[in-house]
């Protein structure tokens, strides 16, 4: 995931193509004329696209977009998308996990079922299953529910997405 500074740098590069007077601020008029040119003179589409941008990115509603406003919008939306995708992927992770390890099909893993996760070459970075059970078992009832698993998988995915990967 890009840092806020990297997002700002990318936005600056992108926005310069729309900033007709190169003052570091985009007006709705500059955006419209830039889009009109990029859309081969289609004024309807350029107007529609300008309206969408103005209504979503112009945080303080002054009719102008600073590079900072655009970068903040991009960073905020990137974070939301990561969280949404992590939530959806975690749900799939939970279903696969329960299908494999929930022997009594009660949508919870008791300690015996949970121990199966650590057997048979299952790839896990954790060696202390009691410690992991304590982390995941949020309500401390000795079982791991589907909701607890989903929260854990979601957190792992968000943590992973937040680290550099090169």
Curated annotation (Swiss-Prot):
Predominant place of localization: cytoplasm
Record keywords: Calcium, Cytoplasm, Cytoskeleton, Metal-binding, Repeat
UniProt key word Metal-binding: yes
Binding-site residues, Ca(2+) 2: 102, 104, 106, 108, 113
Pfam families documented for this protein: EF-hand_7
GO biological process, one term: locomotion
PANTHER family: 45 KDA CALCIUM-BINDING PROTEIN, RETICULOCALBIN
Function: Plays a role during cell aggregation and slug migration.
Protein name as it appears in the record: Calcium-binding protein C
UniProt organism field: Dictyostelium discoideum (Social amoeba)
């Amino acid at each position: 995931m890009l840092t806020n500074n990297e997002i700002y740098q990318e936005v600056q590069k992108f926005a310069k193509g729309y900033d007709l007077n190169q003052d570091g601020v985009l007006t709705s008029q500059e955006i419209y004329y830039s889009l009109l040119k990029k859309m081969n003179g289609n004024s309807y589409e350029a107007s529609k696209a300008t309206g969408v941008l103005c209504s979503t990115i112009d945080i303080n509603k002054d009719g102008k977009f600073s590079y900072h406003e655009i970068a903040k919008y991009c960073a905020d939306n990137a974070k939301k998308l990561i969280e949404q995708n992590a939530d959806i992927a975690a749900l799939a992770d939970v279903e696969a996990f329960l299908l494999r390890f929930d022997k009594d099909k009660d949508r919870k893993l008791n300690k015996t079922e949970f121990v199966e996760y650590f057997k048979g070459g299952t790839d896990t970075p954790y060696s202390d299953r009691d410690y992991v059970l304590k982390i995941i078992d949020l309500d401390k009832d000795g079982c791991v529910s589907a909701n607890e698993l989903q929260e854990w998988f979601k957190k792992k995915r968000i943590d992973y997405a937040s680290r550099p990967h090169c």
